[in-house]
Structure formats: C-alpha cells, structure tokens
Regions:
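Bacterial N-terminal signal peptides that target proteins for export
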Residues: 1-9
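Bacterial N-terminal signal peptides
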Residues: 9-17
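N-terminal "domain-start" segment that seeds a small globular fold
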Residues: 25-56
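Conserved redox-active cysteine motifs that mediate thiol-disulfide chemistry
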Residues: 60, 68-85
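Alpha/beta-hydrolase fold active-site loops
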Residues: 63-64, 142
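Rossmann-like NAD(H)/NADP(H) cofactor-binding core
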Residues: 66, 98, 121
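Structural microenvironment flanking redox-active thiols in thiol-disulfide oxidoreductases
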Residues: 77-116, 127-133
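Thiol/disulfide oxidoreductase modules built on the thioredoxin-like
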Residues: 112-119, 125-171
Length: 174
C-alpha cells in the first residue's frame, strides 16, 4: 500500500514536472499588447528609397514592425539582419517590416541596403518631422514599434533587442 501510494505520488509529480517544464506557450495578442494600447497614426504618405509614395495606412490589417534607423547607428546594423529574417519567415502570414531611415543621404541608404541585402521596404524619414513626432518619443535609434493588426502599438523599444524577443511578440500577433 505504501509502495503504491508512493508510486502514484512520484508518477504524478513527474508528470507535473514534465508538462509544466515544456517550452512556454506563445502569449495571446492581448498579453503582448500591454501598456497604453495607443493606436498608431498611419495616416502618412512617405517616399520610399526610390522616390515612390507609400501610404502607411495601406498596411492596416497586418502586423507591422516599424523600425526607425540610420546607417551610422551600430545597434541598427546589428538588428537589421534579424528583421530580414523575420520578414522572410512571416511575410506570408501578414507581417510587414518597414524601415524608416533618418539619414540625410539617400545614396548612403541605398549602399547600406545593398550591403545588408535588405529586402523589405525602406522609407525616407529624415525630412519628415510630422512622422517622427507621431511616433515620439524616440530617445535614440533604432526605435522599433510592433503594431497589431487592429492598429494598436504593442511595443516600442529603443536600442538593440535580440531577434527572439521581436519574434515572440510577432508570432503572438499573427
């Protein structure tokens, strides 16, 4: 009787440990969008790297990773390869990655894009104080926003953040 009871207790404990120690589940979108839940102002038309007008509100209904960056910014250079990877992996599920360069020189941005093999849209934001104010405060670069399909800003981060942390948020929103 003692052995049977002990076996049941050990088996139950082992099962509990096994099932609760598995990889954490992806959080629901509501858990990811903690904070103010401010709706992103996407009512802007911005020029892309080739001078073409891009209406940000055309991306409503998608999960948007909006990254304000510069070619001279070391943490930006470190993050961009991860954004390329995220874009390649999740664009078919509704992820849009938009880079907003704050550089003065479009030719420098084009060289940078070629060097880093950037394949997502890059917009020119250096002369767009209205756009920068809409997403303020931005204490530095990179400043990256993750925006849910319903337009809520789910996170804002300034500085380098590992790919895995962005991916966790994005997967929960897709």
């Amino acid at each position: 009787m003692v052995r049977t009871t002990l076996g049941v207790v050990i088996g139950t404990a082992a099962s509990f440990i096994l099932f609760t120690s598995q990889a954490p589940k992806i959080k629901a979108a509501e858990d990811v969008c903690q904070g103010s839940g401010k709706v992103a102002n996407l009512d802007f038309t911005v020029k892309d790297i080739n001078g073409k007008d891009v209406a940000l509100n055309a991306f409503k209904g998608n999960v948007i990773l909006l990254d304000f960056w510069a070619t001279w910014c070391p943490p930006c250079k470190k993050e961009i390869p991860g954004f390329i990877q995220l874009y390649n992996t999740y664009k078919s599920r509704g992820l849009v990655v938009l880079g907003v360069s704050v550089d003065d020189s479009t030719s420098d941005v084009k060289k940078f894009m070629t060097q880093f093999k950037m394949n997502y849209p890059v917009l020119i934001g250096h002369d767009r104080d209205d756009l920068l104010r809409a997403f303020a405060p931005m204490p530095g670069y990179p400043t990256t926003f993750v925006i849910a399909r319903d337009g809520r800003i789910c996170s804002q981060h300034t500085g380098f953040l590992p790919l895995e942390q962005f991916e966790k948020k994005i997967k929960a929103l897709l």
